Every structure is written in structure tokens, then in C-alpha cells.
Amino acid sequence: MDKKDYKNVFVFAEQREGVIQPVAFELLGKARDLADVLEEKVVAMFLGYGIKDKAQELIEHGADEVIVVDTPELKDFLSEQYSQAVSQIILDRKPANTALRGNL
């Protein structure tokens, strides 16, 4: 494991029925503070179905980038499917820090 391969601050941007939850904006704010100190980017992980058009809202609240996983399998929140999707993003992108709500 080479630490230089791990970078940026990732946030799980929670949504319910296409509505971004306030906790996502709170996490983005804290992530922005940390990323600024570390001179890194804030990357939001945004999962669900029919949500692509909401990604810009996350940029407006502090994300530098949004990874959108928009698929019918994620229409309803099922922790196993969401956990697998988030785990795959983390394995692929190697964030230095990750902010998730405790009940993912």
C-alpha cells in the first residue's frame, strides 16, 4: 500500500426518493473544511435511481466531483446493495478520507 495512491475526501451523499438529505450537505461542509486543509478535492458518492439530474446540487454545496451510480438496483435503499456499491467506489478510487452516515 502506497499512501500517495490515496487522495481526496469522499462523502456518501444520502438521498431518499430522489431528495438529497440534509445530512449530505452537512457532511459536504465538513469534508470541504478538511479537503481545504489537505489541499485535496471533495468527491460525493451519489447512489440511487433517477437521480442524475440532482448531482449539480452537490457541486453547489461543496463537492468538486460527483460519482453518480444511477441504476434500478439502487431504487430502494437496501444496505447490502448500497454497501457493495460504495465499497467498489472506495476500492477503485482510493480516497484518503471517507465520510459516511453511521447507518449505511
Question: Where does each model-flagged region fall?
Answer:
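N-terminal glycine-rich FAD/FM-binding segment characteristic of electron-transfer flavoproteins
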Residues: 1-104
